[in-house]
Amino acid sequence: MALILKTYQQQAKDALADYFNLAQSVGSASAFTKLTGLPYHTKLDDVPNVCLRVPTGGGKTLIAAHSIAVAANNYANTNAPVVLWIVPSDMIRNQTLNTLSDVRHPYRQAIAATYGDRVKVCDLGSLQTINRHDVGKSCIVVVTTIQAFRISKTEKRNVYAFYEELSPHFSSLTPQQEAGLEIVTAETLLEQPYLTQADIGRVKHSLANWLSMCNPILIVDEAHNTKGKLSFETYKRLNPTCLIELTATPQESNVLYSVSAAELKTAEMIKLPVVLTEHPDGWQACLRDALLQRQQLELDAQKDSNYIRPILLVQAQDKNGEATVEVVREHLISSNIPAETIAVATGDIKELKDINLFSPSCAIRIVITVDALKEGWDCAFAYVLASLQDMRSAKDVEQLLGRVLRMPYAKTRPITSLNKAYAHVVAESVAFAASMLKDKMVENMGFNKWEADLAIQPDLGLSGGVATPSQKITPEVSLNLQHMPDTQLFAKEVSDAIRILPTTQGAMLIISKGTDSDTFTQIELAIVKSAPENMLKKHKKRLMMPVQLGRHLAHLKLGMQHLHQLHNFV
C-alpha cells in the first residue's frame, strides 16, 4: 500500500508542478523568480534547476520518487522518462537501488502509481542490459554516484568508455542526435587499445552518451555533497531535461520550496525534543546511563499498541582511541548484555546486512558504529544515541543524531517518552554540549537557529541513571532587528517578556523562556509598530508585489510567526 503524502510533502510536489508548468512558457529563471521572488542561479543555461529543502527525517527520498512523474508530465512531456538518480555514496546507492527495485516498498510504489509495471531500475553496471525497446516505453531509473561521472578527463572513467554492447542504441542516429555527443579521440585509444585509428571521430557508444541522448531527469539526493564547478560541468555533459536537488542544507541552490523542522514535528515525522545528558566522567558512565535509558524506554514501549523495540546507537571512538568498537563490545558483554542483542556496523564489519530491525523476532537492541551509519541508514526504532567521542572533537555526531530522530510509524506515540529522542555525550558541561549540537543541527541537518534552540532539551537530572520527566523548557530565542525599538510605549506584558540589546545593525530582540502565544502576538504588533515610518512604507510597498519574501520587517514578521509554531516544539 502506497504511503499517503504528508501535507508538506504534497505542497513540495505541488510547488514543483507549478514551477515546471510556468517554466515551459516563461523559462526556468523567470518562472523561479516569479514564484519565489528570489534571484535565480543560472548554472545549467536554461535547464530548470531547482532545490527542495527538507530537514533530516523529512522523507526526501519519497518526495524524490514522486517528483519523477511531476517533471515528466509537467515539463519533459513524456510518459516514459529516463531518470538519473544521483546519490553521494556507494552505501546510499545500494540502499536506494534496493528500495526502488522492491515492488513492495513505498518508494517504488510512488513511481508505480504513474507507470505501473513499466518501471526499470538499474545501476550503471547493469544499464547495458536495458533493452533498446524499453527506451520510450518504460520509466528507466538509473541510480549512481556523482563520482562515477565527475572528472575533467573523461577517458579516465568507465562511464565514458566505448562499449560495443551499447551499439544497438546508437544505430541510425541523425546528425542532430549526434551533435554534442562525445567522440572517440586519440586519448581514447590510449585507454581502450582495442579501438583503432579508424574509430577516431566516431560517436562513442558509451553510457554517458546514451544518457545524453535520453535527456534524463536528474534527481540529486543530498545535493550539498555534489556542489562545485566540476559537478555542474558533469551535469551539462549529460544533457538533462531538468535537475531536481533535495537536501537539508542547500548551498547556492535555487530553493523552490523549504520545509521547516517544526513542520516535520507537526506532521509527526520526527521525535523532538532531543533530551541531552552530558557525562564529564568519561565514556563508561555515558554508556551506562544510555543503556539504562534504553531499558526504561523498552518498558514504556510495552504500553504502546504497536510493536516498538527501542535501539541504542553507540558511536565508539576510532582505532586510535580508548573506547574502540572492540572495547565497547567486550565492555557490554562483560556487563551481562547478551551478545545476540549487539550488532556492529562499521566499514569492515556489517552485521546489520539483511537484518530486518523492525521484525518482532529480531533481538538487536544495541548497534555499535563509528561513522558508517552517518548516512544511508534509517531505523525509526533508534531512540538513544551514546557518543563516546569527546564532544570537542566528535566527528559526524549530528549525522548520527539524525538516525534517532525518525518517529516510529510516522505517528505520535501515546507514551510521552516515546515522542522524544535521547543523546548521551562525553562533555564537561551540558551548555557546551548543547551549543555544539545546536550549531551542527543548523549547519548540517537543516534546522534553523530557533528550531535548534528548542530541539535540544537538557536533562535536569538522573534517577538511578535513568532520565526522569522534567518540566517543560523553552529556551530563549533571539531575532535580529534592523531598527532599535522605542520600548517606552510597550505594554508591561511585552516588556516583561523581552530584552532588547543594541547591535551595529540595529538591535537583537530576545524573547524569554516560557512566553505564551498571546504574548508572542503582542510582541509582534509592538515591534512592527515601533519601526520607523520609512521602513513601514517600504514594507507596505513590498506587500503589494505578487510574490515577495521580502526583507527587513517581512523577515521579522515571518520570524515571529515561526516562533509561534516553534512554541509547541517541547
Label each PLM-derived region with a short phrase:
Residues 1-53:
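Conserved pre-motif I regulatory segment
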Residues 58, 151-211, 291-375, 380, ...:
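Conserved C-terminal RecA-like helicase domain
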Residues 79-111, 145-154:
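Conserved Walker A/P-loop ATP-binding site and its immediately adjacent core
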Residues 81, 125, 134, 206, ...:
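Catalytic cores and motor modules of nucleic-acid processing enzymes
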